């Protein structure tokens, strides 16, 4: 009996199998080389950890700049407190010397010369300490003061400063008048000297206070008084109308 067995795979299938095997062999060898190259180019585990947690290493390293900044901020505060304390002591001591100079009569020339030298020395110390005290803040003070003068909406601060100076000068002149009436003319030049010294100092102090420390108690009182006057006049428009009418009227009509 003859064997009539025939394979189910045709010649076309064999050719396809050869082609498939050839492609597999060609694709098999390059991936190993490619994978080896990729393994060499991949970052190590330590690099991955450092890139994933940069904050932990930064927190471990001490920051010397922060320590230096904290140290620099602590020293100027104590220095400024010392300057303020010394400035206040010198200022009040100078005020006491001026008052004693007005009270004590100077009959001898040597006493007057000694008192003049003492007062001159105290004034020099005050100017020196004041220049040191305002060394860091005088630019800000001048800038704020110029803004208050130039700005048309904030001139009430400067008005309040000059009103304070005027009231202070009037108080000094009243005291001078009563002292002259009680004790004679010998108090005249002393009190006038005191008022001439304290008036510019008070004017500068009030202006600086109103320009740096905005809206003090007296400024609030002034603004509230103006607002109350406007409310009594029926609002802002009525107040402006009354003000314009007063400006248009002549002095003869007012009499």
From Swiss-Prot:
Give its localization.
Answer: Spore membrane
Can you tell which superkingdom this protein's organism belongs to? Eukaryota
Which stretches does UniProt call biased (Polar residues)? Answer: 41-60, 67-78
Residue ranges of region Disordered?
Answer: 19-78
Q: Please, one GO biological process term?
A: meiotic drive
Q: Name one GO cellular component term.
A: cytoplasm
Q: Which InterPro entries does this entry report, sorted A to Z?
A: WTF
Q: Which UniProt keywords apply?
A: Membrane, Transmembrane, Transmembrane helix
TM segments? 85-105, 112-132, 162-182
According to its UniProt entry, the function of this protein is described as: May act in meiotic drive.
The record's similarity note reads: Belongs to the WTF family.
Protein name (record): Wtf element wtf15
Species annotation: Schizosaccharomyces kambucha
| Gene name linked to the record | wtf15
């Amino acid at each position: 009996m003859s064997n009539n067995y025939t394979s189910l795979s045709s010649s076309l299938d064999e050719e396809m199998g050869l082609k498939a095997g050839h492609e597999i062999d060609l694709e098999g060898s390059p991936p190993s080389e490619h994978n080896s190259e990729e393994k060499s180019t991949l970052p190590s585990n330590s690099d991955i950890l450092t890139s994933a947690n940069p904050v932990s290493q930064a927190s471990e390293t001490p920051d010397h700049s922060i320590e230096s900044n904290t140290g620099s901020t602590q020293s100027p505060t104590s220095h400024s407190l010392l300057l303020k304390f010394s400035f206040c002591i010198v200022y009040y001591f100078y005020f006491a010397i001026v008052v004693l100079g007005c009270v004590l009569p100077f009959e001898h020339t040597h006493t007057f010369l000694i008192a003049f030298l003492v007062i001159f020395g105290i004034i020099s110390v005050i100017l020196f300490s004041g220049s040191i005290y305002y060394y860091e803040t005088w630019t800000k003070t001048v800038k704020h003061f110029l803004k208050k003068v130039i700005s048309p909406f904030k001139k009430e601060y400067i008005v309040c400063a000059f009103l304070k100076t005027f009231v202070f000068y009037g108080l000094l002149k009243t005291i001078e008048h009563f002292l002259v009436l009680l004790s004679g003319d010998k108090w005249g030049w002393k009190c006038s000297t005191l008022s001439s010294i304290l008036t510019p100092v008070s004017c500068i102090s009030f202006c600086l206070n109103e320009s740096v420390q905005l809206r003090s108690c007296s400024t609030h009182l002034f603004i509230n008084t103006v607002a109350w006057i406007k409310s009594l006049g029926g609002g802002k428009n009525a107040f402006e109308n009354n003000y314009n009418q007063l400006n248009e009227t002549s002095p003869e009509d007012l009499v």
